Regions:
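Conserved class I S-adenosyl-L-methionine
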Residues: 1-53
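Short alpha-helix
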Residues: 159-174, 180
Length: 201
């Protein structure tokens, strides 16, 4: 069982969406992840939102002209995503078993994004497998972008993966670190409790 399901019980979609809607109404910028991804690949590029949740990032990217596919294991989150953007392709799948061909999806993405603490919330011991699956979905030269917390101040659960461990998973999957930032606004990484990492296949 994933740490996410242990945390939420798999019934979190509406609550999660409501929380972000409230933040948006308060004036908070809700599109940093999409803006960051858009700075890396041009409009029209194929983007996989791995752990897409309610679709906040993917819907924004689609509106910016990207060809997007969303994958998540949480049915309640996907229900919200499908309601908000029924025209977009949303798939329910475990990232540790993700096989694009089985879903009728070409494995030639220009960018795979895993926002929202995806890696710390995976089922224990599946991190390397998930990186391998996501790397395999990239075209040569494609980018894996992952942002996640590294300490309890930035996570709803105890930390479960360090940056060296994540980088080792990426290296094993044939990915090379390109850059690392402290925020989705591309602030330089300062060794703090949150990191956005960019690896290239």
């Amino acid at each position: 069982m994933s740490r996410w399901k242990e945390l939420t019980g798999g019934t979190s979609g509406q609550d999660y969406a409501a929380r972000f809607a409230a933040l948006a109404r308060s004036g908070k910028d809700m599109h940093g992840e999409a803006r960051f991804c858009a700075s890396l690949v041009p409009a029209g590029a194929r983007v996989l939102d791995a752990g897409c949740g309610t679709g906040r990032v993917m819907i924004r990217l689609a509106r910016l002209g990207y060809e997007c596919v969303g994958v998540d294991l949480d049915a309640s989150m996907l229900a919200v995503a499908r309601k908000q953007a029924p025209e977009l392709p949303w798939f329910q799948a475990d990232l540790a078993e993700f096989a694009p061909a089985a879903l009728g999806v070409a494995a030639d993405f220009d960018l795979v994004v895993a926002a929202g603490n995806i890696f710390p919330l995976l089922a224990a011991g599946t991190e390397a497998t998930v990186v391998e699956r996501l790397a395999a979905a990239l075209r040569p030269g494609g980018l894996l972008v992952a942002g996640f917390g590294l300490d309890e101040a930035h996570l709803p659960v105890p930390p479960s993966i360090t940056l060296p461990e994540y980088d080792d998973c990426c290296a094993t999957a044939g990915l090379t670190l390109v850059d690392r930032f402290a925020t989705w606004d591309a602030d330089p990484y300062d060794g703090g409790g949150y990191a956005v990492s960019v690896h290239r296949r």
